From Swiss-Prot:
Keyword terms: ATP-binding, Cytoplasm, DNA damage, DNA repair, DNA replication, DNA-binding, Nucleotide-binding, SOS response
Binding site for ATP: G30, E31, N32, A33, Q34, G35, K36, T37
HAMAP family membership: RecF (MF_00365)
This protein's record includes keyword S-adenosyl-L-methionine: no
CDD domains linked to this entry: ABC_RecF (cd03242)
Protein name listed in UniProt: DNA replication and repair protein RecF
Database matches in Gene3D superfamilies: P-loop containing nucleotide triphosphate hydrolases (3.40.50.300), RecF/RecN/SMC, N-terminal domain (1.20.1050.90)
PANTHER family membership: DNA REPLICATION AND REPAIR PROTEIN RECF
GO cellular component: cytoplasm
KW Iron (keyword) present: no
Length: 371
């Protein structure tokens, strides 16, 4: 799949923009704060109905403007597709081929993207929250059912935490807590199951890619660490039983702290290279190779799952990779994946890639094709 045309109105620093893109590599050059990342962000938003930079949609609307609009014309294997998003003070409206989608889970997944920015290099050494977000973003694009289940889980979790805060310091419990606990565990079982299956699929690709980048010297293993024990066979009744055991063990502390202490919102991923925890013992090079392997594995897994390659968004990240890793990344996507690269200059980009790329220059909210 690839995006053929992007139209923006009152989005970030773009008053109006109407630009066409090529199906291979598109390089966007410009100084900082001129609008390079805003283009990437708009494409990302079209795919996921959210920004990778802020949780507040109204920050995307130009100052004092009543709304922002993002439109994209895409070409997929099964034909053309149009996506349309309008942001306003009342929220957001999304359309697929002109038809409004009432649930975001019905919208997300129409187009797939993989984002790789400097912050993604923290995937290995950063907080568990970064790794959970990685899980949710990538799995959510491939499984609308997972997105729906995750939204249900987050809604019940919010209600349960609210009730726990109300019960803080009180001697008596509330029957509603048992109801919400049962509901939370039922959805938690499904979310955990989907994550477990996703990691098993991702592992196969990531191990192969990491081995290639390390020239056969390293073996990468991804371990999913949910808040309760999961057997390799993923027995759902035992998983459910594990959640209830966790609840029994932690319910007094939950009452004392006013928050839920078990469930998918506390999951994590651990990466091992040659049996060593990369976060704790890995070199910076190993951590970056692991992050790169995961991103390339995402691309292959999406192709395998949905039948089409995603769009790759490289936001100011090539300069963070050494020549060897950059070369491996660009070679892996060559002629297969539509790619957007943002950079302040082209000096650090592979010469052959530049020869085949379409170059755009951005300056103060204006984007123009060079040459």
């Amino acid at each position: 799949m690839h995006i053929e045309r992007l139209t923006l109105k009152q989005f970030r620093n773009y008053d109006e923009l109407d630009v066409s893109f090529e199906p291979n590599v598109n390089v966007i050059i410009g100084e900082n704060a001129q609008g390079k990342t805003n283009v990437i962000e708009a494409i990302y938003f079209l795919a996921l109905a959210k920004s990778h930079r802020t949780a507040r949609d109204k920050e995307l609307i130009q100052w004092e403007a009543p709304f922002a609009r993002i439109e994209g014309a895409f070409q997929k294997q099964n034909g053309p597709l149009s996506l349309h998003v309008v942001l306003s003070g009342k929220g957001k409206k999304v359309k697929v081929n002109g038809l409004e989608q009432r649930r975001l889970s019905d919208y997300i997944g129409a187009v797939n993207v993989v984002m790789f920015g400097p912050e993604d290099l923290n995937l290995v050494k950063g907080s568990p929250q970064i790794r959970r977000r990685f899980l949710d973003m990538e799995l959510g694009q491939m499984s609308p059912v997972y997105l729906h289940q995750l939204a249900m889980y987050q809604k019940i979790l919010l209600q349960r935490n609210h009730l726990l805060k109300q019960l803080f310091g009180k001697a008596n419990s509330d029957p509603m807590l048992d109801v919400l606990t049962d509901q939370l565990i039922e959805v938690a079982v499904e979310v955990t199951k989907k994550r477990f299956e996703f990691i098993q699929l991702l592992q196969r690709w990531a191990e192969e890619i990491h081995q290639a980048i390390s020239r056969g010297k390293e073996k990468l293993v991804i371990t999913y660490e949910p808040s309760v024990h999961v057997s390799e066979q993923l027995n759902l009744s035992k998983l459910r039983e594990g959640f209830y055991q966790a609840y029994e063990q932690k319910k007094e502390r939950e009452r004392q702290r006013g928050t839920t202490l078990f469930g998918p919102h506390r999951d994590d991923l651990v990466f091992f290279v040659n049996d060593k925890d990369v976060q704790t013992y890995g070199s910076q090079g190993q951590q970056r190779t692991t992050a790169l392997s995961l991103k390339l594995a995402e691309i292959e897994l999406m192709k395998e799952t949905v039948g089409d390659y995603p769009i790759l968004l490289l936001d100011d990240v090539l300069s963070e990779l050494d020549d060897y890793r950059q070369s491996h990344l660009l070679h892996a996507i060559q002629h297969r994946v539509q790619t957007f690269v943002t950079t302040t200059n082209v000096d650090g980009i592979d010469h052959q890639t530049l020869q085949e790329a379409t170059i755009y220059e951005v300056e103060q909210g204006s984007l123009k094709k060079k040459g």
